[in-house]
Amino acid sequence: MAGWNAYIDNLMADGTCQDAAIVGYKDSPSVWAAVPGKTFVNITPAEVGVLVGKDRSSFYVNGLTLGGQKCSVIRDSLLQDGEFSMDLRTKSTGGAPTFNVTVTKTDKTLVLLMGKEGVHGGLINKKCYEMASHLRRSQY
């Protein structure tokens, strides 16, 4: 879906994010658009299923993965009306830096953003939420 790439370009434009994706989660979950060569382009249907699934407690204990990147859940309001967001942090491997991640949900899509090193999670959350609100108004 080439038209979705413009949304990714918009999310990446200010330089605060290192990765972004729009993922369809209804029927056959798949990545509609993502930053080429980054983590979110590799998100699997199983990972999407965990994000939107009914079990909201196991990932607090076990974490979850996005495109194979392990993440810790900080706040989960993804299925709550009016909030539709989840805040995560990547898990460090070998002392590497960790990054803030936000996932927001619309009727048909998940919007995912990963901030660059040192970018506050609140900034990522706000940007992700605003894109999801726009998509919701556009019937997505």
Swiss-Prot record:
Q: Which residues carry this modification: Phosphotyrosine?
A: 129
Q: Name one GO biological process term.
A: modulation of chemical synaptic transmission
Q: Which PROSITE patterns match?
A: PROFILIN
What does the UniProt record report as the effect of altering residue 114 to T in this chain?
Answer: In ALS18; the mutant protein is detected in the insoluble fraction of cells
Tissues with expression = Expressed in epididymis (at protein level).
User: Gene3D superfamilies, from UniProt?
Assistant: Dynein light chain 2a, cytoplasmic
Which residues are modified to N6-acetyllysine?
Answer: 105, 108
Post-translationally, this protein is described as follows, namely: Phosphorylation at Ser-138 reduces its affinity for G-actin and blocks its interaction with HTT, reducing its ability to inhibit androgen receptor (AR) and HTT aggregation.
Q: Which family does it belong to?
A: Belongs to the profilin family.
Designated name of the protein: Profilin-1
**The organism of origin for this protein:** Homo sapiens
